[in-house]
Amino acid sequence: MSFTTKVKEELIHLSTGDNNELAAIIKLSGSLGLAHQSLHLSITTENAKIARYIYSLIEDAYVIVPEIRYHQKTNLRKNRVYTVYVEQGVETILADLKLADSFFGLETGIEPQVLSDDNAGRSYLKGAFLAAGSIRDPESGKYQLEIYSVYLDHAQDLAQLMQKFMLDAKTIEHKSGAVTYLQKAEDIMDFLIIIGAMSCKEDFEAIKLLREARNDINRANNAETANIAKTISASMKTINNIIKIMDTIGLESLPIELQQVAQLRVKHPDYSIQQVADALEFPITKSGVNHRLRKINKIADDL
């Protein structure tokens, strides 16, 4: 499973979305058609779970029963494309979500109310990422989050919305549309917090810290950095075990004194045992830290 899919599947298991989220989804992955002298709405995705989620959003908000259709792509990947198809009440949905203008070429940006309200903005960003977002796997060490828009003004509004949350968002125009993107790891982690993907944020941070620890070891090519590398190397097993605990039973399942040591070890892989001991809220001895780290390793080994 890609990291993008992991984030999206976490998002759809959060509490039910709202109209701002649905508006973003429709604007970024929806299209209108005319059949039997009435409008129909099609929302496409390559993820079956997201299709079911969109289905539920529409059904719950408008007491309308959409239809889910699918077809097979003809390219080499042969992915299925799922379409949430709405025949009834389309005009009501468009009017309620203030989307009609965007489909008829009069307005393609983001509603001012969404740009001015924090909660509405968070919901809109969540929907935008579900519909057209992607994150490069943090294991690659090259950090990038992108959201594709058909229209440049929408991409620019999206960047403005992200900037409101203190994110260094930028846009770039392509022949087929425009992309709003983030390239700083800290901005990507903050974005994940904003849209509610807390578990994936923790995973992203753990991978980033582990990569940085490995890079520190690789750069340890002189006497001064060799000592740091030795400390980091000794902590790698513990860091991997802490990540194992986070991914299985969760760090919160540990006693508070073990949680504190675990958080410090992951956050500061280059710290010596003494530095970890000194950094605790209530400092303890080196032997006390070693004792807690051994407990953490044993818990991970028993999983």
UniProtKB/Swiss-Prot annotation:
GO BP term, example: regulation of sporulation
InterPro entries: Homing_endonucl, Sporu_reg_WhiA_N_dom, Sporulation_regulator_WhiA, Sporulation_regulator_WhiA_C, WhiA_LAGLIDADG_dom
Keywords in alphabetical order: Cell cycle, Cell division, DNA-binding
GO MF annotations in UniProt: DNA binding
Pfam families: HTH_WhiA, LAGLIDADG_WhiA, WhiA_N
UniProt DNA-binding residue ranges: 272-303
Family membership: Belongs to the WhiA family.
NCBIfam families reported in the protein's UniProt record: DNA_bind_WhiA
PANTHER family: CELL DIVISION PROTEIN WHIA-RELATED
Reported function: Involved in cell division and chromosome segregation.
Protein name: Probable cell division protein WhiA
Organism the protein comes from: Streptococcus pyogenes serotype M1
